């Protein structure tokens, strides 16, 4: 029987050189390992990432308290449990913590254990993780959101918006879509060089040059699509897709430039322009009418429900509106958003909520209510590629895992190539069918 014999945690480093938690789960006949990611722009409603706070060690970012919680409290509680009982394991983890935001033991401690248990169970069952979680119907490779140009909190430049992404929607296989993304990435690098702009990359592998405006960022990306030999779509209000190979996705991370006292969106890094909620929604409406934008994530701030409603009413029928800081992978906040009719998609970050079971519950709630799900990395990543497995397991249809550089990002893309190969003729790449707008 696959009884848990030992749960071991250690402190490792993520892609930004900051400590994070890695967990090994051992049973009598299997093994699972998971490393926990960490965000730079984090929502205030996220589960708590437990840090040591000792400024003399790793600038206060150590995770030895979380590691100790795994090696003592959690290890003692899980010893002897069936590793295949994921729901019961996650229930026990939540009860051991006992707080609504996982602040006692740390969401980073709980998540590492939860994912490592799932991996150990999959190994015991002789199945890849995507098949163990998703069953025989798990066969959809996700359309990637490829973050090729960075601004905001992810880059030291003068661009307010955090991520400018390409989505290769006009292809019949994941491998062809990945090739498109790589070629556009290299075309963008050459384009930036030709203009004397920096090709240094941000946290997620996208370029981070100083530009004249936020508009220049999206225009450079569209130009690079053409230079790579692909066709960008038209604005969605003009028919949009046709025979397009690539559409644009944005993550402005609007909470990062929202002033809660003034109730204004302030473009602090560029023009200094100040917009209220209605004006910010109109700003995105204008962009969606001007550029081939298929998806906007966090177009409004995390608690600006009124702004979200205005934005959804304006463009929600033709643009995917993804809630990240708004929903934080939390079924309670998602249910609230569904009731209010705001957004039409949820970003899924496993470390925002803290257990695999809660993650799957959020995805299921979204599906049952016509919302799409985008499985996502964090800006602080590791070589762990679990989210690639989860994307296929849930048939989510979309994944957001950075640019076409940095091995912590490529680990996920390459894992999806392996899964596509394993699925063979069963593999499905949805392209534009991944969207419901």
Curated annotation (Swiss-Prot):
InterPro entries assigned: Enolase, Enolase-like_C_sf, Enolase-like_N, Enolase_C, Enolase_CS, Enolase_N
Binding locations of (2R)-2-phosphoglycerate: 162, 349, 378-379, 400
Source superkingdom: Bacteria
Pathway(s) where this gene product acts: Carbohydrate degradation; glycolysis; pyruvate from D-glyceraldehyde 3-phosphate: step 4/5
Chain positions recorded as Mg(2+) binding sites: 251, 297, 324
GO BP annotations listed: glycolytic process
Alphabetized GO MF terms: magnesium ion binding; phosphopyruvate hydratase activity
Broad class of the protein's primary localization: cytoplasm
EC annotation from Swiss-Prot or TrEMBL: 4.2.1.11
Locations listed in the record: Cytoplasm; Secreted; Cell surface
Cofactor(s) demanded: Mg(2+)
Reactions this protein catalyses: (2R)-2-phosphoglycerate = phosphoenolpyruvate + H2O
Keyword line: Cytoplasm, Glycolysis, Lyase, Magnesium, Metal-binding, Secreted
Catalytic residues, chain numbering: 204, 349
Cofactor: how bound: Binds a second Mg(2+) ion via substrate during catalysis.
GO CC terms, sorted: cell surface; extracellular region; phosphopyruvate hydratase complex
SUPFAM superfamilies assigned to the protein according to its UniProt record, in alphabetical order: Enolase C-terminal domain-like, Enolase N-terminal domain-like
NCBIfam families: eno
Assigned protein family: Belongs to the enolase family.
Annotated function: Catalyzes the reversible conversion of 2-phosphoglycerate (2-PG) into phosphoenolpyruvate (PEP). It is essential for the degradation of carbohydrates via glycolysis.
Protein's name in the database: Enolase
Species name: Prosthecochloris aestuarii (strain DSM 271 / SK 413)
Gene giving rise to this polypeptide: eno
